[in-house]
Amino acid sequence: MIFARLTALAAFAGIVSVANSADPAPTHVPPSLFKLSDPDLEISVWAASPMLKNPTNMDTDQHGRIWVAEGVNYRSQSKHQPAGDRIVVLEDTDGDGKADKSWTFVQEPFLLAPMGICVIDNKVIVSMTPDLIVYTDVNRNAKFDPGVDKREVILSGFNGRIHDHSLHSVTVGPDGQWYWNAGNSGAQFTDKSGKTFRIGSAYDPYYGRTNPGDLGWNPREIAGSKSDDGFVWIGGFAARMNPDGSGVRILGHNFRNSYEQTVTSFGDVFQNDNDDPPACRVAFLPEGGNAGFCSADGKRSWQVDRRPGQSVATAQWRQEDPGTMPSGDVYGGGSPTGIAFAEESALGEKHRNLLLSCEPGRNTVFGYYPKPDGAGFKLERFDFLTTNPEGKFVGSDFIGGATTVTRELHTLFRPSDVMVGADGAIYVADWFDPRVGGHATMDETLGGTIYRIAPKGFKPTVPKVDLSTPEGAVAALRSTAVNVRGAAFSAVKEHGSKAQPALEKLLKDEQPHIRARAIWLLSHLPRAKARLLELMADKDDNIRLTTLRVIRQLEDRTGSGLTKPFQGDMRGAGTNDGPWYAWQSVKVWTDPSAAVRREAALGLRDVVWQTMGDGRNFYTQDAQQAFIVLAQRFDGKDRAYLDALGLAVRGREAKGYDLLKPSLGNADPLKWSPRWAWIAWRLHPPQSVADFKTRALAPSLPDAERKRALAAITFNHSREAAEAMLEIAAATDKLVKVEAIWWLLNRKDNDWAGHGLANALKTRGIYDPDKIQLTAVVVPEPPKVSQPFSLPDLAKLKGDTKRGALIATACYTCHRVGKEGVEFGPDLTGWASRQPLDVVLRSIVEPSADIAHGFAGHELTLKDGTVIHGLLLADADPVIIMSTGGITQTVPKNRIKEKKPLGRSLMLSAEQMGMGPQELADIAAFLRTK
């Protein structure tokens, strides 16, 4: 929950004090406490409170002014500012590198912690759930006047008002389209083309409660619904559309809560995403990609489907499930927020193509230089900017939340957004807060800061922008600010053919990303296809990739070859009017670049394949042949490429399988090549079940391949698949037997419901709910009058690590520490070394004071009086609960009388374990070495 984090990001600065309580509380982290990755750069304060308050998001306009969305009114504090939240404008009028002027553009009661701001010339787009609002500053005075200016809601229907898992900011892509995303609170909206999108998930944003401003439905109620584009989209999602709100196209889905996206000049989309367990990520988003947070129908959480032995990162992003995209850089706990891509900036050549991602949970802005890696990207992370280089994090949910809050100034840097300014400098917005998480606002000062990162001695200069002339509009395409380029795109498009000479000059630039910006506009000018054909022969991979994307969008607009069949045969000599996949001169499916071939595969998703009524196939054969050739070029390793092949035939996997098997498969499934085994797993149609059963039962195959065969069967919903799994469960081979039984229990009431599995499991002796023996497991309540441990006194004791190692063996029954222990409670490896000593001690003395997210216990009371305490692994029928020591029990639902939250920790307190002060000091000393 990012804004939950951001507003408890807004933990009150009032608790942050200097040694002398009479001194005023600090209002920002001084630049001297920051560490930059490049010693040639410097950081300075560009603006600070009271010029702005609680910044959630920011943007820059063509004049170099910075516009900020404020989040003062949030959840419990939604009436803090009765007039509503503000969009604030800040300006450096004298060019000294510091803002000296600020004013309110708009303030209204409807604005309650808006999550996005985008400025495109005189249009100001504000993301305020349930609406996407466009304010048009008609008189261009940067002050909204209802009598003169315009306010329009162009999209509405996003759930989660005053909740950060909802609508986020708009950014303009290199194609002039508006890109935006929303978290997994759900959405039902109709675009200006009349298409309705219904996007639900397994997430309940209000935990069964109602909330003011809700739309009258819960995302669980619409999970699995088909949208008018013919696809099922779930969870958090990203989209693009025309500036008027028409032509919405979903770019990816099944996120948890991606805060923002950034789009390169080539059209590559990067995003970050989070969850409270340690599996936050930064990733490349392929068109149509499924991130995997929920099940494919959006009805089950990843926790329910987590397989035995899977790590959190693997299970959360379903990296062992067919149909999910590569998860990218999964870096652990955190709460990622704003993201930006700097193709060029004032930072210089060595920082070209710099991807920046804010991580307030770690007091850091991450940096990456994405490198093509097959059909995807390699993302090597580093701390571009941090106040916590030692990684001793506090105040974040992933390391204990409120119990870990300290007053150390360097821990209060909480970046909420990052961007490249119109002057080329990097700007970072900061909440300045000791806490991240908790759906709470605690900041009494409502503080906020904007920092500037630039070369030492940098003198800001904002290039003058003149969109009124073709030459001026084309020149503005070189701007370092993404939405200034967006305004330039619209202006160039409006100038039409008059801009062609200036665009042709831009096409000759030595930098590929500059050339790419011109290519996107070619499709709006005369002779577009002929010019694009020439560019498809360019030696630069990114230019060919961009050109193919432009061609796809061109045909999507004109309707030929993608969304409907093209009537006629245009493959004759000299004509290039047919659909792109039939152009003989555009051999995209044999392109040497895996990224170009990936894009070609993604484009096939929308091609009509079926034969029409009069027997003509309208390029069906061309599309099918392209798919075969693309599959033949899969190297058997590249997961990004593999997923693109699956997306190419989404909804027609069986047809794709039959097309490929003659040339890539083998009649004997034990002789399959790695390439075909992976493709078959990704497509897993009904006709593959028998072959995968053979592979699952073959001890000659590696264990990983046998388990993959089981997964391929499981993700097939047919009766044949369920019966095959029953046969595997009856096998004597323990490896597949145990996993097959797990799959049967997991699927019997969802994907395989209706196949009679309950009776089959009973008659075959695999699972009979009437014969299940259950054991009571009760965690005793701590004593009402606790032993008076004094944390300050405990912290003074010298601990003995050797004695602590012996005492810690008791921890291994519930916790993982290094290579020892059970994965029941939170993994303690490295945890204590990152925490202040008093935090470590308190977690042992008072474990219920702050329970780690994801480890809240439940109490099951059975009809026979048996009580079981533990963590719910599956809340279906049967209920699966894991108790102390990792004991896992399968509980038939009809035997449960009551199920309720435990309300306290599943861990015994130090007093209950009979630990004295010295033993506490010893075990804390030991844990801090691990």
Regions found by a protein language model. Give the residues of each.
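C-terminal structured "cap/appendage" subdomains that terminate the fold
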Residues: F432, I741-L744, G865-V867, L872-R904
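Sec-exported extracytoplasmic/periplasmic mature domains
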Residues: D137, W609, Q632, R650, ...
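N-terminal secretory signal peptides that target proteins for export/translocation
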Residues: M1-I2
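Bacterial N-terminal signal peptides
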Residues: T7-S17
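Long, ordered, helix-rich scaffold segments
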Residues: L446, I453-I807, F824, W831, ...
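C-type cytochrome heme c attachment motif
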Residues: A425, T449, L521, A805-K819, ...
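Beta-propeller domains with acidic blade repeats across secreted/periplasmic ectodomains
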Residues: S21-G472, A487, A491-E494, G818-G821, ...
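Beta-strand-rich binding/interaction modules
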Residues: F366-Y368, R485, D875-I881
